[in-house]
Amino acid sequence: MDATFWAFIALVIFVAIVVYMKVPGMIGRTLDERADRIKKELEEARTLREEAQQLLAEYHRKCKEAEKEAGDIVASAEREAKALLEEAKRATEEYVARRNKLAEQKIATAETDAINAVRASAVDLAVAAAGSILAEKVDAKAAGNLFNDALAQVKSHLN
């Protein structure tokens, strides 16, 4: 029996002890557990990746919605500003037109008042001149006749 034989026997005994102690099963279970743990980690990583992609897609969607909403707000503000500007312009034009009309009415009233004042002054002047001329040239008898004629004219106009 040489050394190779004893080495073979030792190897067989060692393998028998390893099998008796169920080392291959423990190694298998350990490897299976590790494989399961790796599978779970891969599945969890896949799930996290999908969630991240969903969150990214949602973020992009919300970003686009926010941009659209901001654009709508700007467009609405521009429309409102334009409407306010047009309303202010229209109101200013109406105000100017009213003020012009009022000024024209005041001018027309002042013109009418001035014409009436001139006429009244002319009538007063004519009456005063006629009175002074009549006072110089008409005697009492002629004044009575003139008064009677004037009274007759007034009566004829009133009837």
Curated annotation (Swiss-Prot):
The chain crosses the membrane at residues 1-21. One of its GO terms (cellular component) is proton-transporting ATP synthase complex. One of its GO terms (molecular function) is proton-transporting ATP synthase activity, rotational mechanism. InterPro entries: ATP_synth_b/b'su_bac/chlpt, ATP_synth_F0_bsu_bac, ATP_synthase_B_chain. Keywords: ATP synthesis, Cell inner membrane, Cell membrane, CF(0), Hydrogen ion transport, Ion transport, Membrane, Transmembrane, Transmembrane helix, Transport. CDD domains: ATP-synt_Fo_b. It is a single-pass membrane protein. It comes from the Bacteria. Belongs to the ATPase B chain family. F(1)F(0) ATP synthase produces ATP from ADP in the presence of a proton or sodium gradient. F-type ATPases consist of two structural domains, F(1) containing the extramembraneous catalytic core and F(0) containing the membrane proton channel, linked together by a central stalk and a peripheral stalk. During catalysis, ATP synthesis in the catalytic domain of F(1) is coupled via a rotary mechanism of the central stalk subunits to proton translocation. Component of the F(0) channel, it forms part of the peripheral stalk, linking F(1) to F(0). F-type ATPases have 2 components, F(1) - the catalytic core - and F(0) - the membrane proton channel. F(1) has five subunits: alpha(3), beta(3), gamma(1), delta(1), epsilon(1). F(0) has three main subunits: a(1), b(2) and c(10-14). The alpha and beta chains form an alternating ring which encloses part of the gamma chain. F(1) is attached to F(0) by a central stalk formed by the gamma and epsilon chains, while a peripheral stalk is formed by the delta and b chains. This is ATP synthase subunit b 2. It comes from Brucella ovis (strain ATCC 25840 / 63/290 / NCTC 10512).
